[in-house]
Amino acid sequence: MATYCDDLGPSSAPPGQAQATAHPPGYEPGDLGAVGGGPLLWVNAPALSPKSYASGPGPAPPYAAPSYGAPGPLLGAPGGLAGADLAWLSLSGQQELLRLVRPPYSYSALIAMAIQSAPLRKLTLSQIYQYVAGNFPFYKRSKAGWQNSIRHNLSLNDCFKKVPRDEDDPGKGNYWTLDPNCEKMFDNGNFRRKRKRRAEASAAVRSGARSVGGAEAPALEPPSAACLDLQASPSPSAPEAATCFSGFASAMSALAGGLGTFPGGLAGDFSFGRRPPTVATHAPQTLNPSPGFAPGHQTAAAGFRLSHLLYSREGTEV
């Protein structure tokens, strides 16, 4: 059969099949016999699946299927990918996003919003829970974690005040209200903890100073007129600067004498133009310096509090 086809040549075949009888690239004539049916059978079967070629010896050659170039089943209709995206967006709308995304508010801000939404500006703990879970679906999933945070913020934040129930008001649990001084601190979802007042902080500092010193420290003298003129004038004269510094030195000497924390003789060294003494005159002789440290390091370390405060650099103006 193969010899008959070769003798006839291309004239015996129809014009449409002349080019189709060419062997596919990568195949020898011996391989065509393994198909079963000769070359005419291969020519008359254009839709032959590539499975028969893969069963032959050698690696599978590059084979172009007859349907090459046609839209495959995986591509789908035009715009199929966009349709899938739209379907996904339709399932997750605004309400679905609220359930998945945590609101950008702190727990203190949530409590403040709940209290401000009440007609009487006061709510119980359970009512605050209901407001948070009703307006923010994200908190409906796990209630244990954020409810504990709500309780901690109510007890630790000074801006939330506990109000007891009236006698004619049935129910259990106290009310929580917002301090009027803290209403201005709530802005755009940010709610900061209330800081201590300056008067309370200064009173705490004064009480701590009394407990450390054993007695009330003498108050510093008010600045004299020469000091005020010194601040106003750009280039003060030498006598005015000396008067201002002598007043400051006398106030520091009085403070050192009242507290009794400075070594003897150190308070008298605050005169103008004198440096504090070295550690060699005040340090105990029983202390042994550690190896590798010279006495000069101890002198610099001990005189840091006052010498570096008053004489930070040689030639610095006071």
Curated annotation (Swiss-Prot):
Residues 102-196 bind DNA. Transmembrane segments: none annotated. Keywords: Activator, DNA-binding, Nucleus, Transcription, Transcription regulation. SMART domains: FH. Pfam families: Forkhead. GO terms for cellular component: chromatin; nucleus. Possible transcriptional activator. Residues 1-30 are annotated as: Disordered. GO terms for molecular function: DNA-binding transcription factor activity, RNA polymerase II-specific; RNA polymerase II cis-regulatory region sequence-specific DNA binding. PROSITE patterns: FORK_HEAD_1 (PS00657), FORK_HEAD_2 (PS00658), FORK_HEAD_3 (PS50039). It comes from Homo sapiens (Human). This is Forkhead box protein I2. One of its GO terms (biological process) is regulation of transcription by RNA polymerase II. It is found in: Nucleus.
